[in-house]
UniProtKB/Swiss-Prot annotation:
Species this protein is from: Bos taurus (Bovine)
Pfam family, one: PNMA
UniProt cross-references to InterPro entries, sorted A to Z: PNMA, PNMA_C, PNMA_N
Main localization of the protein described in the UniProt heading: nucleus
Keywords on record: Acetylation, Nucleus
Region listing for Disordered, in residue ranges: 335-364
ATP-binding keyword on record: no
Protein name: Paraneoplastic antigen Ma2 homolog
Family to which this protein belongs: Belongs to the PNMA family.
Segments forming a coiled coil: none
Amino acid sequence: MALALLEDWCRILSVDDQKSLMVMGIPVDCSEDEIQEVLQEILKPLGRYKLLGKIFRKQENANAVLLELLEDPEVSVIPSKVQGKGGIWKVIFKTPNQDTEFLERLNLFLEKEGQTVSGMFRALGHQGLSPAAMPCISPELLAHVLGQVIAHPPQPLLPMRYRKLRVFSGSAVPAPEEEPFEVWLEQATEIVKEWPVAEAEKKRWLMESLRGPALDLMHIVQADNPSISVEECLEAFKQVFGNLESRRTSQVKYLKTYQEEGEKVSAYVLRLETLLRRAVEKRAIPRNIADQIRLEQVMAGASLSEVLWCRLRELKDQGRPPSFLQLMKVIREEEEEEATFENENTEEPEGGDGYGHWGNEAND
């Protein structure tokens, strides 16, 4: 266990494990200067510290470093994670009077919920239980509070649960679990809007889904502009990994897309919509006339029945072209009508005058 490693390491070096931190997950190629640069910024609220040593952890394929805090630490301001080279570095520390195994399990549970122990106390609003007082709280009291969280999760905790993004690497040969870039981008664009946290946290969550060249690009754009927004990061991904067809190409591709032989009109409209949205994104077609352009292209590029053509012509003459869903509703209704009419004709009995046995009885 990580905390046990911290205790053993401190015991070997004869330092106080209550005034020490262990940072894990540091890439092997990260120099000491790079490590110091990250730690100095993140651990500034803790005052002076001393770097005691570094070890390689084979199971993580990463390094860990041990720090000695030279001033009495304020546990409530110690971060559990820091953003470093190659991704997230975990910070391991020991609090006074804590039960090692219990608190490790508690932290693991809260980590899955997107929470911390101090954040849990703030959310529950316990009288007299501030984050600064947390080191002196007994495991029994922590267990009681955890039971409250499980039985009655407070509202401030719930929004912190967030939908995670699928993995994306941008590699030439993607992993089996990866989505195509366009699918991943569409998902990411929608999900990041739901994350109820600050931009810095959104960028950290976004980075958790990135691997390989995609992660490298994220580091580059953040280095160029530390205040860059998540939306701007996704725009950078679109420029590097997306389809780079020109405005003119996307416009021509849309206008020259026609209904194929044997293809239903509704299927054609659905296929056309993907191209239209791409053209709008490229600003090849103004967004405010997209409904009008869609209707005109369907009337020009599809083989329509006389009834459907008249209905669409009527919609066009009204001056308020239908939205995509409204247009699909009209087309699907007409397709259902045509299918019903064809079925009725198919089911009519064979015979000369079409009256069936009723007509035969009348002639008797």
